[in-house]
């Protein structure tokens, strides 16, 4: 929050963010990971306090970041109100070996963000995603498994994501990216 006049502050605004995470465990079809996020600002914040869309595309092949838009370029979309939905369905382990335990996943990510009074921010053109941003993905968790102990291992995930918003043919690095993720298995 910012308070005009407090410590010579020039901006008055308040913000509220909500983040809900839930994992649904199904007997036959794996797990559904669900994350919903929303945020709202009152007043007129400075540019560095606006909500920045959680984007993680920095190239054609990059690191997978949970609960972020894999195909959205970083630091492009700004808002003072937003709603995001991240859903990932795992299908279960396809097979198990000492060095591989691949688990198919399907992902859908959606977001909407609106920037009111964008002209109040001088010196830069700010974009919002008020028409929505949608992407889908598929890949394998634990494609490579590196055992550390009998009950503990390091896993490497690989997935591809496509930006549905662009409605353009597949273009690696623009609307399609390949992501590599890392995690611990126990």
What are the functions of these language-model segments?
Residues 1-186:
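Exposed, low-structure sequence patches enriched in small/polar residues
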């Amino acid at each position: 929050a910012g308070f005009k006049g407090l410590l010579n502050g020039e901006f008055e605004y308040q913000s509220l963010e909500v983040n809900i995470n839930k994992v649904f465990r199904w007997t036959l079809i794996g797990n559904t990971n669900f994350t919903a996020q929303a945020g709202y600002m009152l007043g007129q914040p400075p540019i560095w306090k606006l909500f920045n869309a959680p984007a993680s595309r920095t190239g054609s092949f990059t690191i997978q970041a949970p609960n972020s838009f894999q195909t959205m370029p970083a630091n492009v979309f700004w808002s003072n109100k937003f709603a995001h939905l991240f859903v990932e369905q795992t299908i279960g382990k396809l097979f198990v070996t000492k060095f591989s335990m691949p688990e198919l996943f399907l992902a859908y990510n959606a977001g909407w963000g609106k920037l009111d009074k964008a002209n109040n921010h001088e010196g830069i053109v700010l974009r919002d995603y008020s028409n929505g941003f949608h992407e889908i993905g598929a890949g394998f968790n634990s494609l490579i498994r590196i055992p550390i102990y009998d009950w503990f291992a390091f896993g490497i995930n690989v997935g591809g994501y496509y930006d549905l918003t662009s409605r353009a043919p597949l273009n690696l690095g623009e609307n399609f990216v390949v992501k590599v993720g890392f995690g611990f298995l126990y």
